[in-house]
């Protein structure tokens, strides 16, 4: 589960990077990651926070209006949204907190199946707003990004 959460975090930052033609975005790199907290909100929803070490060779930027859906075999599995996160210039630890809830088509048994997590089974829709420190802003959306491809970024 920790790995899936970190993959989604990388997906958010990678999506932000793809939204600009800035050559330095391709030089973003990710290091250690972990879960800061997970708190059940109900049987079908959790709140939590994750951290990841990021090396950002360009100006800092804010990722906001973060929303997404995880699909398992093409069927909506989890819906989520997260608070704004700032990725500073240089190296540092970025923390993102948010809420995730099972979609109506998912069962609690599906959550137990995460024990045998296979990234080939999952894809992600993400939408974010990116604001560079210089003030330039762009909204970027991607649909059905394979989780297996996001794994290659970690």
What do the predicted segments below correspond to?
Residues 8-16:
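Bacterial N-terminal signal peptides
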Residues 74-110:
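Intrinsically disordered, low-complexity Pro/Gly/Ser/Thr-rich segments with frequent PxxP/GP/PP motifs
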Residues 59-67, 79-81:
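Short, hydrophobic/aromatic beta-strand segments
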Residues 21-49:
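Low-complexity, acidic Ser/Thr/Pro/Gly-rich terminal tails and inter-domain linkers that flank the onset
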Residues 54-56:
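Short solvent-exposed capping/turn motifs at the termini of beta-strands
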Residues 104-154:
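Terminal connector regions
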Residues 1-4:
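Positively charged n-region of N-terminal signal peptides that target proteins for export
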Residues 70-72:
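Conserved aromatic beta-strand anchor motif in extracellular beta-sandwich/beta-rich domains
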């Amino acid at each position: 589960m920790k790995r899936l959460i970190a993959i989604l975090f990388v997906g958010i930052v990678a999506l932000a990077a793809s939204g600009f033609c800035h050559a330095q975005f391709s030089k973003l790199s990710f290091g250690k990651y972990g879960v800061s907290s997970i708190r059940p909100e109900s049987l079908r929803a959790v709140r939590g926070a994750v951290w990841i070490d990021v090396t950002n060779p360009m100006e800092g930027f804010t990722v906001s209006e973060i929303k997404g859906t995880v699909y398992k075999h093409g069927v909506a599995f989890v819906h989520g949204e997260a608070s704004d996160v700032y990725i500073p210039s240089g190296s540092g630890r970025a923390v993102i907190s948010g809420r995730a809830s099972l979609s109506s088509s998912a069962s609690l048994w599906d959550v137990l199946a995460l024990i045998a997590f296979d990234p080939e089974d999952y894809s992600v829709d993400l939408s974010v707003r990116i604001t560079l420190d210089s003030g330039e802003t762009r909204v970027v959306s991607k649909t059905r990004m394979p989780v297996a491809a996001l794994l290659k970024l970690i």
